[in-house]
Swiss-Prot record:
This is Gamma-D-glutamyl-L-lysine dipeptidyl-peptidase. InterPro entries: NLP_P60_dom (IPR000064), Papain-like_cys_pep_sf (IPR038765), Peptidase_C40 (IPR051202), SH3_16 (IPR041382). Substrate binds at residues 83, 118, 237-239, 256-257. Its EC number is 3.4.14.13. It catalyses: The enzyme releases L-Ala-gamma-D-Glu dipeptides from cell wall peptides via cleavage of an L-Ala-gamma-D-Glu-|-L-Lys bond. Specifically hydrolyzes gamma-D-glutamyl-L-lysine bonds in murein peptides, releasing L-Ala-D-Glu.
Length: 333
Protein backbone atom coordinates (compact mmCIF):
# COMPACT_ATOMS: atom_id res chain seq x y z
CA UNK A 1 0.00 0.00 0.00
CA UNK A 2 -7.64 -3.02 13.74
CA UNK A 3 -14.20 -6.89 29.74
CA UNK A 4 -16.68 -9.44 36.06
CA UNK A 5 -19.87 -8.85 38.03
CA UNK A 6 -23.45 -8.09 37.03
CA UNK A 7 -22.40 -5.32 34.68
CA UNK A 8 -20.08 -7.68 32.82
CA UNK A 9 -22.78 -10.30 32.43
CA UNK A 10 -25.18 -7.66 31.12
CA UNK A 11 -22.63 -6.49 28.58
CA UNK A 12 -21.79 -10.04 27.58
CA UNK A 13 -25.43 -10.90 26.99
CA UNK A 14 -26.26 -7.79 25.02
CA UNK A 15 -23.19 -7.56 22.83
CA UNK A 16 -21.88 -11.08 22.42
CA UNK A 17 -24.98 -13.27 22.06
CA UNK A 18 -26.06 -12.44 18.55
CA UNK A 19 -26.80 -15.91 17.24
CA UNK A 20 -30.25 -14.90 16.03
CA UNK A 21 -28.97 -11.68 14.52
CA UNK A 22 -26.10 -13.11 12.50
CA UNK A 23 -26.82 -13.34 8.83
CA UNK A 24 -27.30 -16.76 7.29
CA UNK A 25 -24.97 -15.82 4.48
CA UNK A 26 -25.73 -16.81 0.94
CA UNK A 27 -23.90 -15.86 -2.20
CA UNK A 28 -24.49 -12.23 -3.19
CA UNK A 29 -26.36 -11.46 0.04
CA UNK A 30 -25.96 -8.13 1.83
CA UNK A 31 -24.66 -7.90 5.38
CA UNK A 32 -23.10 -5.40 7.79
CA UNK A 33 -19.87 -5.41 9.77
CA UNK A 34 -20.66 -6.34 13.39
CA UNK A 35 -17.29 -5.52 15.01
CA UNK A 36 -15.30 -2.32 15.54
CA UNK A 37 -13.22 -3.09 12.45
CA UNK A 38 -13.12 -6.31 10.48
CA UNK A 39 -9.77 -7.22 8.94
CA UNK A 40 -10.05 -8.83 5.51
CA UNK A 41 -7.58 -11.48 4.39
CA UNK A 42 -6.42 -12.60 0.96
CA UNK A 43 -7.43 -16.19 1.75
CA UNK A 44 -9.58 -17.91 4.39
CA UNK A 45 -8.05 -19.63 7.41
CA UNK A 46 -4.78 -17.71 7.16
CA UNK A 47 -4.66 -16.77 10.84
CA UNK A 48 -1.66 -17.31 13.05
CA UNK A 49 -2.36 -17.70 16.79
CA UNK A 50 -1.33 -14.08 17.31
CA UNK A 51 -4.00 -12.92 14.82
CA UNK A 52 -6.93 -14.47 16.72
CA UNK A 53 -7.88 -11.22 18.57
CA UNK A 54 -8.57 -9.62 15.17
CA UNK A 55 -10.93 -12.41 14.10
CA UNK A 56 -13.28 -12.67 17.08
CA UNK A 57 -16.59 -10.97 17.85
CA UNK A 58 -16.00 -8.63 19.57
CA UNK A 59 -12.48 -7.94 18.34
CA UNK A 60 -9.51 -6.72 20.36
CA UNK A 61 -7.51 -4.81 17.78
CA UNK A 62 -5.24 -3.10 20.28
CA UNK A 63 -4.20 -6.48 21.68
CA UNK A 64 -3.54 -7.71 18.15
CA UNK A 65 -1.51 -4.77 16.91
CA UNK A 66 0.44 -4.16 20.12
CA UNK A 67 1.38 -7.80 20.69
CA UNK A 68 2.97 -8.33 17.27
CA UNK A 69 6.72 -8.07 16.87
CA UNK A 70 8.10 -6.21 13.88
CA UNK A 71 8.77 -9.48 12.09
CA UNK A 72 5.19 -10.58 12.71
CA UNK A 73 3.91 -7.30 11.27
CA UNK A 74 6.22 -7.58 8.28
CA UNK A 75 4.88 -11.07 7.57
CA UNK A 76 1.46 -9.54 6.91
CA UNK A 77 3.02 -7.17 4.39
CA UNK A 78 5.67 -9.31 2.73
CA UNK A 79 3.41 -12.35 2.40
CA UNK A 80 0.52 -10.12 1.27
CA UNK A 81 -1.85 -11.70 3.77
CA UNK A 82 -4.30 -8.82 4.25
CA UNK A 83 -6.59 -6.86 1.92
CA UNK A 84 -8.31 -4.05 3.85
CA UNK A 85 -10.47 -3.29 6.87
CA UNK A 86 -14.18 -2.51 7.10
CA UNK A 87 -15.72 -0.54 9.96
CA UNK A 88 -18.68 -1.26 12.23
CA UNK A 89 -21.90 -0.85 10.24
CA UNK A 90 -20.22 -0.83 6.84
CA UNK A 91 -22.21 -2.70 4.20
CA UNK A 92 -20.72 -5.64 2.33
CA UNK A 93 -21.87 -8.11 -0.30
CA UNK A 94 -21.12 -11.76 0.44
CA UNK A 95 -19.94 -13.53 -2.72
CA UNK A 96 -18.44 -16.81 -1.47
CA UNK A 97 -18.22 -19.00 1.61
CA UNK A 98 -15.70 -21.60 2.80
CA UNK A 99 -16.36 -23.11 6.19
CA UNK A 100 -16.61 -20.34 8.77
CA UNK A 101 -15.20 -17.73 6.39
CA UNK A 102 -16.91 -15.59 3.77
CA UNK A 103 -15.58 -13.57 0.88
CA UNK A 104 -17.08 -10.09 0.80
CA UNK A 105 -17.01 -6.92 -1.25
CA UNK A 106 -16.73 -3.82 0.95
CA UNK A 107 -18.99 -1.03 -0.27
CA UNK A 108 -17.52 2.46 -0.34
CA UNK A 109 -13.93 1.37 -0.99
CA UNK A 110 -13.52 1.86 -4.76
CA UNK A 111 -11.15 -0.48 -6.55
CA UNK A 112 -10.64 -1.59 -10.16
CA UNK A 113 -10.66 -5.16 -8.84
CA UNK A 114 -14.46 -5.14 -8.48
CA UNK A 115 -16.90 -2.35 -9.22
CA UNK A 116 -19.11 -3.27 -6.25
CA UNK A 117 -16.43 -3.01 -3.60
CA UNK A 118 -13.10 -4.11 -2.19
CA UNK A 119 -12.73 -7.92 -1.97
CA UNK A 120 -11.43 -10.00 0.88
CA UNK A 121 -12.08 -12.91 3.24
CA UNK A 122 -13.29 -12.53 6.82
CA UNK A 123 -14.81 -14.67 9.59
CA UNK A 124 -18.55 -15.00 9.07
CA UNK A 125 -19.17 -14.36 12.79
CA UNK A 126 -18.07 -10.75 12.29
CA UNK A 127 -21.11 -10.09 10.06
CA UNK A 128 -24.73 -9.47 10.93
CA UNK A 129 -27.95 -8.42 9.24
CA UNK A 130 -30.74 -6.43 10.84
CA UNK A 131 -33.62 -5.01 8.82
CA UNK A 132 -34.08 -1.98 11.07
CA UNK A 133 -30.44 -1.04 10.57
CA UNK A 134 -30.65 -1.69 6.83
CA UNK A 135 -33.68 0.60 6.58
CA UNK A 136 -31.81 3.43 8.28
CA UNK A 137 -28.55 3.37 6.37
CA UNK A 138 -29.64 6.35 4.25
CA UNK A 139 -31.12 8.30 7.17
CA UNK A 140 -29.45 10.87 9.47
CA UNK A 141 -26.29 9.50 11.03
CA UNK A 142 -23.53 10.22 13.50
CA UNK A 143 -19.93 10.16 12.27
CA UNK A 144 -17.21 9.33 14.80
CA UNK A 145 -14.66 12.14 14.68
CA UNK A 146 -12.10 11.02 17.29
CA UNK A 147 -9.35 8.48 16.48
CA UNK A 148 -11.38 6.00 18.51
CA UNK A 149 -14.43 6.46 20.73
CA UNK A 150 -16.36 4.46 23.31
CA UNK A 151 -19.98 3.41 22.83
CA UNK A 152 -21.98 3.00 26.03
CA UNK A 153 -24.94 0.80 26.87
CA UNK A 154 -26.72 3.68 28.62
CA UNK A 155 -26.42 7.48 28.73
CA UNK A 156 -24.98 7.40 32.25
CA UNK A 157 -21.77 6.04 30.66
CA UNK A 158 -21.37 3.45 33.42
CA UNK A 159 -21.16 0.42 31.15
CA UNK A 160 -19.00 0.39 28.03
CA UNK A 161 -20.05 -1.67 25.05
CA UNK A 162 -17.20 -1.34 22.56
CA UNK A 163 -14.53 0.96 21.20
CA UNK A 164 -15.13 2.14 17.63
CA UNK A 165 -12.96 3.79 15.01
CA UNK A 166 -12.80 7.21 13.46
CA UNK A 167 -15.12 7.47 10.44
CA UNK A 168 -17.62 4.93 11.82
CA UNK A 169 -21.15 5.91 10.76
CA UNK A 170 -24.20 4.88 12.77
CA UNK A 171 -27.86 5.89 12.37
CA UNK A 172 -29.11 8.45 14.89
CA UNK A 173 -32.13 7.44 16.98
CA UNK A 174 -32.29 10.30 19.49
CA UNK A 175 -30.09 12.59 21.55
CA UNK A 176 -29.83 14.39 24.86
CA UNK A 177 -27.64 17.30 25.87
CA UNK A 178 -24.40 15.29 25.98
CA UNK A 179 -24.92 12.09 23.98
CA UNK A 180 -26.25 10.62 20.76
CA UNK A 181 -28.31 7.43 20.88
CA UNK A 182 -27.33 5.33 17.86
CA UNK A 183 -28.42 2.08 16.26
CA UNK A 184 -25.91 -0.74 15.96
CA UNK A 185 -25.91 -3.13 12.98
CA UNK A 186 -27.11 -6.01 15.16
CA UNK A 187 -30.21 -4.03 16.18
CA UNK A 188 -28.96 -3.04 19.62
CA UNK A 189 -28.76 0.57 20.77
CA UNK A 190 -25.84 2.47 22.26
CA UNK A 191 -24.79 5.96 23.32
CA UNK A 192 -21.92 8.06 21.96
CA UNK A 193 -20.67 11.25 23.58
CA UNK A 194 -21.38 14.29 21.42
CA UNK A 195 -17.75 15.32 21.82
CA UNK A 196 -16.81 12.15 19.94
CA UNK A 197 -19.01 12.53 16.87
CA UNK A 198 -20.83 14.84 14.49
CA UNK A 199 -24.44 14.58 13.33
CA UNK A 200 -25.30 14.80 9.63
CA UNK A 201 -28.71 14.60 8.00
CA UNK A 202 -27.25 12.98 4.90
CA UNK A 203 -23.99 12.29 3.10
CA UNK A 204 -24.50 15.51 1.14
CA UNK A 205 -24.69 17.42 4.43
CA UNK A 206 -20.97 16.84 5.06
CA UNK A 207 -19.32 20.18 4.18
CA UNK A 208 -16.66 20.36 1.50
CA UNK A 209 -13.39 20.44 3.43
CA UNK A 210 -10.65 23.00 3.24
CA UNK A 211 -7.15 21.61 2.89
CA UNK A 212 -6.43 22.43 6.53
CA UNK A 213 -9.42 20.30 7.58
CA UNK A 214 -7.80 17.29 5.91
CA UNK A 215 -4.42 18.09 7.43
CA UNK A 216 -5.83 18.50 10.94
CA UNK A 217 -7.58 15.15 10.59
CA UNK A 218 -4.32 13.50 9.58
CA UNK A 219 -2.47 15.07 12.50
CA UNK A 220 -4.88 13.42 14.97
CA UNK A 221 -3.18 10.13 14.15
CA UNK A 222 0.46 11.19 14.56
CA UNK A 223 2.29 8.38 16.34
CA UNK A 224 -0.27 5.70 15.45
CA UNK A 225 1.67 2.57 14.40
CA UNK A 226 1.31 1.37 10.82
CA UNK A 227 -0.67 -1.77 10.08
CA UNK A 228 -0.83 -3.34 6.63
CA UNK A 229 -4.35 -3.03 5.14
CA UNK A 230 -5.51 -0.76 7.96
CA UNK A 231 -8.30 1.77 7.44
CA UNK A 232 -9.14 2.49 11.07
CA UNK A 233 -8.11 4.43 14.14
CA UNK A 234 -6.46 1.21 15.31
CA UNK A 235 -3.90 1.47 12.50
CA UNK A 236 -3.54 2.50 8.85
CA UNK A 237 -1.54 1.55 5.82
CA UNK A 238 -0.50 4.39 3.53
CA UNK A 239 -3.51 4.44 1.21
CA UNK A 240 -5.94 3.48 3.96
CA UNK A 241 -4.79 6.65 5.72
CA UNK A 242 -5.43 8.96 2.76
CA UNK A 243 -8.65 7.16 1.75
CA UNK A 244 -10.05 7.50 5.28
CA UNK A 245 -9.10 11.16 5.67
CA UNK A 246 -10.89 12.10 2.48
CA UNK A 247 -13.89 9.85 3.04
CA UNK A 248 -14.54 11.23 6.50
CA UNK A 249 -14.88 14.63 4.86
CA UNK A 250 -17.38 13.43 2.27
CA UNK A 251 -14.98 12.73 -0.61
CA UNK A 252 -14.64 9.10 -1.72
CA UNK A 253 -11.36 8.26 -3.43
CA UNK A 254 -9.96 4.85 -4.44
CA UNK A 255 -8.82 2.54 -1.66
CA UNK A 256 -5.30 1.78 -2.95
CA UNK A 257 -2.37 4.01 -3.84
CA UNK A 258 -2.13 2.87 -7.48
CA UNK A 259 -5.72 3.81 -8.38
CA UNK A 260 -5.42 6.96 -6.24
CA UNK A 261 -2.49 7.99 -8.45
CA UNK A 262 -4.59 7.59 -11.61
CA UNK A 263 -7.64 9.57 -10.50
CA UNK A 264 -8.21 13.13 -9.41
CA UNK A 265 -6.42 15.95 -11.25
CA UNK A 266 -2.73 15.67 -12.07
CA UNK A 267 -0.57 18.33 -10.39
CA UNK A 268 2.97 19.39 -11.26
CA UNK A 269 5.42 19.25 -8.39
CA UNK A 270 6.04 22.99 -8.47
CA UNK A 271 2.30 23.62 -8.10
CA UNK A 272 1.64 21.40 -5.09
CA UNK A 273 -1.00 22.64 -2.69
CA UNK A 274 -2.04 21.51 0.78
CA UNK A 275 -4.20 18.39 0.64
CA UNK A 276 -2.73 17.08 -2.61
CA UNK A 277 -1.78 13.42 -2.62
CA UNK A 278 1.80 12.65 -3.60
CA UNK A 279 2.97 9.29 -4.89
CA UNK A 280 6.13 7.21 -4.92
CA UNK A 281 7.03 4.39 -7.29
CA UNK A 282 9.64 1.72 -7.81
CA UNK A 283 12.45 2.19 -10.34
CA UNK A 284 13.22 5.78 -9.39
CA UNK A 285 9.60 6.85 -9.69
CA UNK A 286 9.01 5.27 -13.10
CA UNK A 287 7.66 1.86 -12.02
CA UNK A 288 4.54 0.82 -10.16
CA UNK A 289 3.25 3.11 -7.42
CA UNK A 290 3.88 1.67 -3.95
CA UNK A 291 3.26 4.58 -1.57
CA UNK A 292 1.11 7.67 -1.04
CA UNK A 293 1.33 10.64 1.31
CA UNK A 294 -0.55 13.92 1.70
CA UNK A 295 1.18 17.24 1.11
CA UNK A 296 0.71 19.65 4.04
CA UNK A 297 2.64 22.68 2.79
CA UNK A 298 6.13 24.11 3.38
CA UNK A 299 7.71 21.12 1.65
CA UNK A 300 6.33 18.60 4.15
CA UNK A 301 4.08 15.56 3.90
CA UNK A 302 2.11 13.41 6.35
CA UNK A 303 1.82 9.66 5.83
CA UNK A 304 1.57 6.21 7.38
CA UNK A 305 4.87 4.83 6.06
CA UNK A 306 5.54 1.18 6.84
CA UNK A 307 5.52 -1.51 9.53
CA UNK A 308 8.65 -0.17 11.23
CA UNK A 309 7.14 3.27 11.78
CA UNK A 310 4.06 5.29 12.71
CA UNK A 311 2.06 8.14 11.18
CA UNK A 312 4.55 10.99 10.83
CA UNK A 313 5.36 14.29 9.16
CA UNK A 314 8.58 14.44 7.14
CA UNK A 315 10.01 16.63 4.35
CA UNK A 316 9.05 15.62 0.82
CA UNK A 317 12.73 15.68 -0.12
CA UNK A 318 13.63 13.04 2.51
CA UNK A 319 16.19 10.58 1.06
CA UNK A 320 14.53 7.32 0.11
CA UNK A 321 11.37 9.15 -0.91
CA UNK A 322 12.30 12.04 -3.15
CA UNK A 323 14.20 9.71 -5.51
CA UNK A 324 10.97 7.74 -6.05
CA UNK A 325 8.63 10.71 -6.47
CA UNK A 326 6.03 9.77 -9.09
CA UNK A 327 3.63 12.70 -9.27
CA UNK A 328 0.68 14.18 -7.43
CA UNK A 329 -3.10 14.29 -7.67
CA UNK A 330 -5.64 16.81 -6.42
CA UNK A 331 -9.00 15.63 -5.10
CA UNK A 332 -10.24 18.86 -3.57
CA UNK A 333 -12.57 20.93 -5.76
Amino acid sequence: MKKVGTAFLTTLFIFSSFTSAHAEEKKDSKAFIDVSAATLWTAPDSLRPIDVPSATNPVDLWKWTKSMTLDEKLWLTNANKLETQALLGQEVTVVDKKGDWVKVLVHGQPTPRNEEGYPGWMPEKQLTYNQEFADKTNEPFVLVTKPTAILYINPSEKHKSLEVSYNTRLPLLSEDTISYRVLLPNGQKAWLRKNDGTFYRSQNDIPTPAADDLINTGKMFLGLPYIWAGTSGFGFDCSGFTHTIYKSHGITIPRDSGPQSRNGVAVDKEHLQKGDLIFFAHDQGKGSVHHVAMYIGDGNMIHSPRAERSVEIIPLNTPGYIEEYAGARRYLP
